[in-house]
Amino acid sequence: MPPPVEKGFVAVGGSGQRAIAGTTLPVPYTVSVTDDAAQPVAGATVSWTTAAGNGSVSAGSTTTDAGGHASVLHTLGPASGSQTVSATLGASTATPVRFSTTAVSSAPAARVAEVAIPANYGIHDTFVRDGLAFVCAWNTGLIIYDVGYGIRGGSPSSPVEVSRIAPLQGSVSGLTGAIHNAWWFHHPVSGEKRYVFLGQEGPGVIGSASRGDIYVVDVSDLVHPQQVASFGLAGAGTHNFWMDEAAQVLYAAYYNGGVVAIDVSGTLSGDLSSRLIAQVKPGGDDSTYTWGVQVANGSVYASDMVTGLWQLSLASAGMGVMSGRRVPDRWTSDLWVTGGFAFTGTWGGSLRRDSTGTLNPGNALKAWLLQPSGAPVSLPDSLILEGVGTVSDVEVSADGRRLLLTAERGPAGGFFLYDLADPLHLRFVASVAEAGGLHTGTFAKIGGRDLVFAARNPGDPALVIYDVTGALQ
């Protein structure tokens, strides 16, 4: 049988990065080679040469793998500006592929502060609003920092603790500590900023079991926060939140309990179980383990570790399942919906076996196109991050221009920023490597600067704050 005829030769990743001159890019340039039947060609030789910028490549030539992909790393030259590398396919007449990167003289992301967190497991999510950072410090509880609010004279480069609180044992979960996430509620009618909702993430088993309650903390006096109410579901534990503040409804991902909607209008005290509006398990009783939830475009979107991405109706419309798309090859993690697109991360605490028998880590970002009805349609190409095992947090900047990913479980852990000018073709902008990776990250704008508040955990837990103003311009 004659060898396949090499026909397709295209770039599939790495172009359009932005990095400091003289450094090696974090994402390799990658080409794809296919035959006349559009099937990948293995064993093809691809030659790489620097075309502009006086940089270097990690190899003069590489060979395509079973998927038809060949890659090389580019070390930038010393000058700022555009730097390019050309890829040529063996003796083929295929047009060479050119990759371009912008070299800059200073880092597009710079660390401005690091706040040590007690190693009582450490730090999980951080919620930032109005110059206050609400740090979920697991068994230590909630720690509130002034990072620009003014009550303690703190700033992003010099956070100052305002107060802390360790909630009591959960009335349903029976657990103490394990404070995982927070949301500071701004009342749309009264203007009150009275309540912070806290989520408790207890032990669990993917697909079948979890524990953890929701706590309500009154922060009318920021210096002396008080626990005033709680909510729990027997046999299930909460994970991430989203608030429809206009409707005064808290939506909570509840792992094997699915998604719940809670009425949080008025004064909150005691047991809030009577305020449950609706509950739905998107994948059914035996296939639901919901990680995250978000209200967007008049729907509720839920990312489920076992089944994928779901569209639900709002609580006011009964919160039923409207549509969904399954992700069977990896465990799904966080989500973010922006305009007509959605993005979901993947978790790699344990590998997941796909239909071919391959065990896959959680190193993929899944992109979704939302139909006019809001129903998600999975796009064929995922973003694969080499050197990480989990894409743990996903967020889009307030202006919709940048996508933030945090990653861990591998040598390339940290955070990554991508340009969303064309959501179908993400363009790498910047990354920051952090030993041990970053578990969570969120955007904030304080004093005219764009920031990322990230959690390094466990090992040497810390709240790490980066100025990414240059990367968001």
Where are these regions (language model features)?
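Feature marking well-ordered beta-strand scaffolds used for ligand recognition
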Residues: 104-473
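The feature marks long extracellular or luminal low-complexity segments
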Residues: 1-106
